[in-house]
Amino acid sequence: TIGATTAFSSLWLTPKISAFWKIHPSITVSQVVSDVPGMTGRCDLTIHYGNPQENGVEYRKLFQDHIIALGTTRFAAEYRISRLEALLKAPLIHSSSKETGWTSWHDWFAALGFPAPKGRSFYVNNYMIALQAAQDDVGAVLGWDGLVGSLVNEGRLVKLVQESIPSPVGFHLRIHRRATAKARLFADWLATSP
């Protein structure tokens, strides 16, 4: 059993499980999907965003992303976004869930040496809803390129500007003590799969 947030499960983990089953069809993988901290406590494996700080706990780094500004081509055309200065004035979608510790627009612009954005704001506490809102032209959204790659590849969202920042932390897989040999095999595969 593996626990992850809705966004991580939908955008990254579920496609990986499909690939894993092609190699290991006899191993059952169950997901516990929750955006509430602590709801994945009975899992063999859990995925976390941040730097692990617990001593004696086994973790594997999955990846560390770059954070990019995303929107639709219609949104980019309507707000004439080709440079950061235009993005500062455009409507922005903010992920307001404190549990994630994700980078905010204010953090993103500051890391690039720009002031806080001045455009209209839309706040949401679920990253999947934030991504859907961006696809519906509500505003621009920050994207972790390892998570949102499929949305960009399918043309549902595009990079609005060339600038990006490295994510301050990565995504890690926690291997709980109760993890079975099959769960560990899955963990090893996840940590090394492309």
PLM features: residue spans?
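Alpha-helix/helix-capping structural signal
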Residues: 6-7, 73-74, 128, 146-147
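Central regulatory/effector-binding core of bacterial HTH transcription factors
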Residues: 1-55
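Tryptophan-centric aromatic hotspots in well-structured domains and transmembrane helices
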Residues: 12, 54, 102-108, 124, ...
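Acidic, Gly/Pro-rich loop/turn segments at junctions of secondary structure
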Residues: 32-101, 106-117, 121
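A late-sequence structural motif
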Residues: 163-194
